[in-house]
A protein has these predicted regions:
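His-Asp-centered metal-binding catalytic motifs of divalent-metal-dependent phosphohydrolases/nucleases
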Residues: 81-100, 120, 124, 143-149, ...
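A ubiquitous short alpha-helical element
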Residues: 52-56, 107-113, 153
Length: 224
């Protein structure tokens, strides 16, 4: 009687072992790129801050990385692997270095932004090294994250276009609600100057609310 009960338990254990082995096998079959995206997303999924997307709360930096990738591929469907990796890791673990840890001054803000770029590039490099990427690819990804070749490098410009479009589509309205109008117009103008004609055209097609549309029109009118 005991052996009859124990037998199914042994089969269940064997089945669990097979499932575990199957999972490991699937992981081994992932390309380096797929492994990198999975690792980047797992890191960003740890962000304690959330943002609503389609009514669902999601980790903020995970959502940001996905949106940045989406825009980058809209602008350039055949983007290089290095560019796709840089887009997905652009804000990697950003919440670990909060703005509040720096002086609330212009100098403090600039230092924070500089340190963030260094942090993101180092973090991405560590993950890519663990996966086994060649040094040349890692260097290129870090170069794009650090914006070392902007604006002369077409790939760096493409990444900047995607960053600007994510801002205009997903962050502009929130910023407009808590920023003085004249200051906001300056921010929009600075953003617009960094964008290529293709990205500007894409931005003009975004479904802005009336207030944001008016602010954008004012900013662009002053640029002419």
């Amino acid at each position: 009687m005991l052996s009859a009960i124990a037998k199914p338990l042994r089969l269940g254990h064997a089945a669990r072992q097979m499932t575990h082995q199957s999972s490991d096998s699937k992981s081994e079959r992932l390309s380096p790129y797929q492994q990198a995206i999975r690792r980047f997303d797992a890191e960003n999924a740890r962000d304690p801050s959330t943002e609503l997307a389609d009514g669902v709360a999601q980790p903020r930096e995970l959502l940001y990385a996905q949106r940045l990738t989406e825009w980058m591929l809209k602008l350039c469907p055949d983007a290089s692997e290095e560019l796709r990796l840089a887009a997905r890791s652009q804000h990697l673990c950003r919440w670990m270095i909060p703005r509040s840890s720096y002086a609330m001054t212009r100098a403090g803000y600039l230092r924070w932004r500089t340190d963030l770029k260094t942090f993101h590039s180092q973090k991405a490099g560590e993950i890519l090294r663990e996966i086994g990427y060649p040094a040349a690819i890692i260097t290129r990804v870090q170069e794009l994250i650090l914006k070392k070749t902007f604006p002369d490098d077409p790939e760096s410009r493409l990444l900047e276009d995607a960053l600007c479009l994510v801002f205009l589509q997903h962050q502009f309205a929130d910023l407009a609600a808590r920023t003085a109008e004249e200051k906001l117009i300056g921010i929009v103008q600075k953003t617009w100057r960094k964008m290529t004609p293709a990205a500007r055209q894409a931005a003009l097609g975004l479904p802005f609310a009336e207030r944001e549309k008016r602010l954008l029109e004012r900013a662009l009118a002053q640029e002419q």
